[in-house]
């Protein structure tokens, strides 16, 4: 109930960001930031297990500030402004998913300001995305139109097969 997912509109190549992080590995500030991100992941897990969601949100912000120090390619002025405006609207913290550089921004906010944060992010050009937790792990679909029979649909599930005539 407290997480928002916002598409930043930025397209990026993750490999370039990761290469830059590897290059920066030997720099003290970038290395310290990597260590902080790792420590924060453990701290966030502990806060979630304790049910302390407010602290979890604040730790997300610490993590984002640390991640940005790992490479100058992780963020850009548009992403920073989107993030900062979400914080001003009441979000406690957030992060770009994946390597950074664009894609989706995940924000944690108290439920009573969630709609205010979402509205502000949309005003700033972000695109809010609907999402749900998937308890079965990552799911993917592949559609091969050449093999598709438009007269019937068959679904294979662990507990049985289903066939639908169209």
Located regions from the model:
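Glycine-rich active-site/cofactor-binding loop and its immediate structural neighborhood
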Residues: 102
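C-terminal nucleotide
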Residues: 1-94, 106-166
């Amino acid at each position: 109930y407290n997480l928002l997912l916002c598409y930043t509109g930025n397209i990026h190549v993750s490999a370039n960001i990761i290469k830059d992080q590897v290059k920066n590995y030997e720099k003290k500030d970038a290395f310290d930031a990597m260590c902080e991100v790792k420590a924060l992941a453990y701290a966030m897990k502990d806060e979630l297990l304790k049910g302390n969601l407010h602290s979890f949100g604040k730790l997300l912000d610490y993590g984002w500030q640390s991640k940005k120090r790992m490479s100058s390619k992780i963020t850009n002025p548009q992403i920073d402004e989107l993030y900062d405006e979400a914080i001003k609207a009441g979000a406690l913290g957030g992060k770009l998913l994946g390597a950074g550089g664009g894609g989706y921004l995940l924000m944690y906010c108290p439920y009573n300001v969630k709609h205010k944060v979402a509205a502000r992010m949309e005003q700033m050009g972000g695109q809010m995305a609907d999402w749900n937790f998937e308890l079965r792990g990552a799911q993917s679909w592949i559609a091969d139109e050449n093999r598709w029979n438009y007269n019937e649909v068959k679904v294979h599930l662990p507990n049985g097969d289903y066939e639908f005539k169209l």
